[in-house]
Amino acid sequence: MLICAAGDIHGALNRLYEDVLAFEEALGVRFDYVLHVGDFGVWPNANRIDKATRNHDGAGDFPLWLAEGRVAPRPTVFVKGNHEDFEWLDSHQGEQVLPGLIYLRNGCSVDLRDPHSGAIRVAGIGGCYGPSDYGHRSDELQGYAKRHYTLDEIERLVNTNSVDIVLTHDAPAGVCFNRHRRGAGYKSEARGLDVLLTHLRPRVCFFGHHHTRVDAEISGVRCIGLNKVAMPGNLVAIEMQVGTCDWSLLGEYVESRQGSRYG
């Protein structure tokens, strides 16, 4: 199965899928799925965006995609980031927020199906670590606190069988960054995500949030941190064999281009 993992896009859906298709062309493949690590930019109403989003790129492309009912060019699974309309996501019925765009809720898993060879299981914990909210139940969080994941969400996942990929927004505790806005050598303190990897033993973990490309090994699991949209290291391609431990990194998309065929 051919999978493209993508970093934070903050509403730049047009650019994401332009780059995904260009990446396919460069590799000479067609992706079966796109996996997204959160900060997708789910803002159905541009008037509801949070302060950080308002100060940067605004609501982005999602409101128009939603209004027009656009179809994701490739089946896409995403977890929430820390900049989304959490109330809208919580109240949304069903898996798909748009045709082909699947929201993987915290503490849940989804099977990526291949009609010829079976399925690959993806487990997800979106949002970022918040020390003051971590011990609360997820259904107790209100407003902007919903950007945080909670211990009970992790506990719902730890006994899930046969997980191949873990998709998180924040970096598992222990991931060290050579370059980071908090300074070189910054180490993630996102509790619980490292424990989740210890229990699930997936083949690989993808994360975003920190807007930098980084590789790490946590609890014996390969962890790949992805850069933000339009930056080198935003897209990574892997091939994963169903029913085995085999997977390989096919390449990374490094070209930075302007414009969009979806504008």
Predicted regions and their residues:
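Beta-strand-turn-beta hairpins that frame and shape the catalytic cleft
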Residues: M1-C4, S109-G124, I165, E217-R222
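Active-site neighborhood of phospho(di)ester-bond hydrolases with catalytic His/Asp-centered motifs
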Residues: A5-G7, Y33-D39, R74-H83, L104-R105, ...
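Core catalytic region of metal-dependent phosphoesterases/phosphodiesterases
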Residues: A6, L13-D114
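Active-site environment of divalent metal-dependent phosphoester hydrolases
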Residues: H10-L16, G41-A46, V79-D90, V110, ...
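Active-site-proximal segments of metal-dependent phosphoesterases and phosphodiesterases across multiple
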Residues: G41, N47-L66, N161-R201
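Conserved beta-sheet core of the metallophosphoesterase superfamily
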Residues: P75-V79, G94-P99, G174-D246
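Active-site-proximal loop/helix segment associated with metal-binding centers of metalloenzymes
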Residues: P115-G183
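A short C-terminal boundary segment appended to hydrolase-like catalytic domains
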Residues: V242-G263
